[in-house]
Amino acid sequence: MRLLAGWLCLSLASVWLARRMWTLRSPLSRSLYVNMTSGPGGPAAAAGGGKDTHQWYVCNREKLCESLQSVFVQSYLDQGTQIFLNNSIEKSGWLFIQLYHSFVSSVFSLFMSRTSINGLLGRGSMFVFSPDQFQRLLRINPDWKTHRLLDLGAGDGEVTKIMSPHFEEIYATELSETMIWQLQKKKYRVLGINEWQNTGFQYDVISCLNLLDRCDQPLTLLKDIRSVLEPTQGRVILALVLPFHPYVENVGGKWEKPSEILEIKGQNWEEQVNSLPEVFRKAGFVVEAFTRLPYLCEGDMYNDYYVLDDAVFVLRPV
């Protein structure tokens, strides 16, 4: 037992020391690490670090249908987004931390999903919008406040934290036990997957951020959201990665097609956006505003950060 305790203390001390002394900013150390871990089965290259950030926000309005042209909100790289990027770049350079994460992920992926592993390690935080971008999209001021927020599929709660100053009560749902643990540490009220629809009260804002392409019944989910949203002033803020590639993650990192398929058509971002108002109409919503934003994730030893193209909508019930 003493030997085990000593080994654990030594491991923790090594991690702490590595965090302070080692980074992958050095070309030599990064090359050494990649050579140690790369191979035919290594991860594919991501978009982090090399893409012109201006392109993350570009929308060709001429390709949008008329009803969407008038509600498009142009977004830009702002201070809140830049802070997230800077922090992610710094974390990706912690050599021994990244080695430790890689080892744990390899072992735990045999019986845990990638999402749960990230929750256990406290890594892989997502970024959808900054406080300023959230306020501009909802057309609210920094002091605006209402009663209840429900964040569906909240992950580790970092995006929830950006919205939380505007709400008196904050509810969240999450499948991953380790992510639920992260949410509870932030003092959010976690509801069960089949509980949030049956609480007996309504929500003023419901966020559904990058969830529709990762759930088994996305249209049913939209209709359930409509049924518990405050019917006059309630709003939904919904983010969706485009191009649309739906799949459901199971234990062990296996992927399956969802049982409900949304009719999203088109080959590029604008074309797929044009097909979404009809999807929302079937669930009882109309688009009040939307924008294009990068969906960012903290990086690792391979990339400073990861990025996908998001369409973020504000929906009102009809």
From Swiss-Prot:
Tissues and organs where the protein is expressed, per its UniProt entry: Expressed in liver, colon, small intestine, skin, kidney and to a lesser extent in spleen, lung, thymus and stomach. Not detected in fibroblast and endothelial cells.
GO MF entry, a single one: protein-L-histidine N-pros-methyltransferase activity
EC class of the enzyme, as a word: transferase
Entry annotated with the keyword Magnesium: no
Enzyme Commission (EC) number: 2.1.1.-
Residue pairs linked by disulfide bridges in the UniProt entry: none
The keyword Lipid metabolism is annotated on this UniProt entry: no
Glycosylation sites recorded in the entry for this protein: N35
Record localization: Endoplasmic reticulum; Mitochondrion
Name of this chain's protein: Protein-L-histidine N-pros-methyltransferase
Annotated organism of origin: Mus musculus (Mouse)
Gene from which the chain derives: Mettl9
